[in-house]
Amino acid sequence: MIPSWNSVGLLPALLDSLRDGGEELEVLVVDNGSSDGTVELLRERNVPHLALPRNIGFAAAMNRGIAATAAPFVFGLNADTVVAPGAIAALRQVLAGDPGLGGVQPRILQLEDSNPGNPAAARLYSAGMALTRDGRAVETGAGERQAEVFLRKREIFGVCGAAWLLRRELFARLGGYDESYVSFYEDVDLNVRARIAGSHFAYVPEAVVWHLGNASWQAGFERPGAENARLVSRNRIATQAKFIPATSLPRIVAVELGSLLRAARQGRLGATMRGKLEGLARLPRSLGERRRLARQGDLDAVRRWLGVY
């Protein structure tokens, strides 16, 4: 499942890697109203796709695409990824072999750091999603060389939205991505809800996917950095409010103030502040979701992962 938006320069490498991987796959690209020839490229290559008339956001596009397919496992990919041979088979084997797993994540490497033919030389993009003590999402191992610890299969808090394999049943039971997020932190929110519902996730290093890092997002905006800052600030607050313990509030306030200082240095103070105000305005909804989640499961299923990398 591949959402795209003005990704005509990115999709060929991904589609070629899926074709050459030796797997029988049902590929579907959901195009978010591209204007750069993406849909024409998909037609020329006979790639199954949904052509949406406008950009409805990453989260909504993924929901539309997954609803249009029927496979028991869904492999979600960003348009700026390349899949190494054997990756899908390795992920599927682990997920199919453990009914307690809701999803698995490959070893995601930085595409700009090296050639896809030489994974040993690349830096990590993600060895699994983790949460800081104050509930911010981080990618384990991001930017690091591949030490032995990143070459072992292990349980992780959650899966990175750039590349994951999930059970369709879990995705449907959770109601899919929260479309109000639009983009950014929608994967964090899904992981939070899955954990509270009793699901688990694993990191499978034998499976390798290369990721260019926000290239598929940047292609569609004149000022991608500012929009990124607004959405991340907004959606982080909305997500933290669903599970974070009250004892973490002083830490969160300190971190958020620090983020404003960094945003000012980067010329993104206005966008970051707008995002924070929007996140605060959403608090009644987020707290209502927190109460609902607490009735359905255990918030400690998320909290015990705070600060665990």
Place the predicted regions along the sequence by residue.
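Short, acidic, metal-binding catalytic loop of nucleotide-sugar glycosyltransferases
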Residues: 16-24
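A conserved acidic beta->alpha catalytic loop
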Residues: 17, 31-40, 54
